[in-house]
Amino acid sequence: MKFFRGMIGFCIAGMIVMSVWTPLAENYGIFGGYLAAFIIIGPMWFMNHHVGLIENDEDAAFVDMAVGIGICGIMRDVFMRGGGELVSSLPTIGLVAIGAVLAGIVAAAIEKDMARKHEAKQEKTEPGMNIKEEERLNENQLV
């Protein structure tokens, strides 16, 4: 049931974004884009994440509405203009995947660094010594 709730949430968000955002942006310019972001994404986020149509487990990768909106946009063009649209979007999808992998690597490095700094704060040091001095002493086995 969780899968179907997520699919419904993704589909609703994707269809509304694809049908409303472009006319607002075309008719009202930049203001229309901001207006669309406010009147579409806000309520869709509330429905999907706050109400709980899309559930994200603590131990799983976070899946946001952007995935559903992106898939909806790609498939809309495939249905309207044919399979060539999917083929022409593959380089963009590939670059997005590479960006996601790089972002994951950077996020993991940041988390690792934050954990290391947190552990360093937890360690007790000798009065008047900082952690680096104590590490140097431990490496030289002077303690």
From Swiss-Prot:
It is found in: Membrane. The keyword Lyase does not apply. Residues 118-143 are annotated as: Disordered. InterPro entries: DUF6905. It is a multi-pass membrane protein. The keyword Transmembrane applies. The chain crosses the membrane at residues 6-26, 27-47, 60-80, 90-110. It comes from the Bacteria. Induction: Repressed by GolR. One of its GO terms (cellular component) is membrane. GO terms for biological process: glycerol metabolic process. Could be involved in the glycerol uptake either via facilitated diffusion or active transport. This is Putative glycerol transporter Lin0368. It comes from Listeria innocua serovar 6a (strain ATCC BAA-680 / CLIP 11262). The lineage of its organism: Bacteria, Bacillati, Bacillota, Bacilli, Bacillales.
